[in-house]
Amino acid sequence: LIEAFRQNQCTNRLISTLLRFFFYLLYGSMAWTYDWVAGFVSRGLWQEWVLEVAADLRGPKVLELGHGPGHLQKALFEKGIGICGIDSSRQMGRLAHKRLKTGGLEPNLVNGFAQHLPFASGSFAQVVATFPTEYIVDAGTLAEVRRVLDRAGELVVMPVAWITGKRLLERAAAYLFHVTGQAPEWDDRALDPVRETGFKVEIERRKLKSSELLIIHARKI
């Protein structure tokens, strides 16, 4: 039994290492495949999930952390919201820039890290992140987010989604999400660093047709 447990731990570490390398490529040299891969593993729901958050953003100025290929950027531009974006991936920056320019929009994108936001204090009413990695609860990130938010500012995060549909392809997608660690069981303790930084946290589970989203609203106190 102990040996089986150890083998399982080794397997999980190997899978985790391989996934980290895969995502490193996906945000780097293979960024051009991001939309296809995200759409495939989510059964085409990925963009719908990202755009669902647009309803929670009122502006007038919003900063998106990890803007990726720019789908939310475009949606907020079209809503008339003043939107900025920052991403550590230059490749993602190029994809988002092209998407916005093609739509006749003027990008306001920065290459950089959430722990060092190049914006003045109190610049934004809201900061948003969809499917961020663990950087979102880093002490440096949270301190910077709090700094750039105005006095009544809010951090909006969608960290995870679950595919709940019962059709064969939906069940297969849910399984793929589970084994790749993209749909973990939620543990509210993950938000302790957010609360400790001076935010009041509200958690919403939003049910869609064949999926469920976890959306976090964290307001400055």
Label each residue range with its predicted role:
Residues 126-137:
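A short SAM/SAH-binding and catalytic strip from SAM-dependent methyltransferases
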Residues 203-221:
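Core SAM-dependent methyltransferase catalytic element
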Residues 152-159:
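Conserved beta-strand signature within the Rossmann-like core of class I S-adenosyl-L-methionine
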Residues 115-126:
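A short acidic, Gly/Pro-enriched loop at the edge of an enzyme's catalytic core
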Residues 63-65, 69-116:
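Class I SAM-dependent methyltransferase SAM/SAH-binding core
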Residues 182-197:
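Short alpha-helix
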Residues 5-57, 71, 170-173, 177:
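Conserved class I S-adenosyl-L-methionine
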Residues 140-151:
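A short glycine-rich, Lys/Arg-flanked "PGG" loop and its adjoining helix->strand segment in the class I
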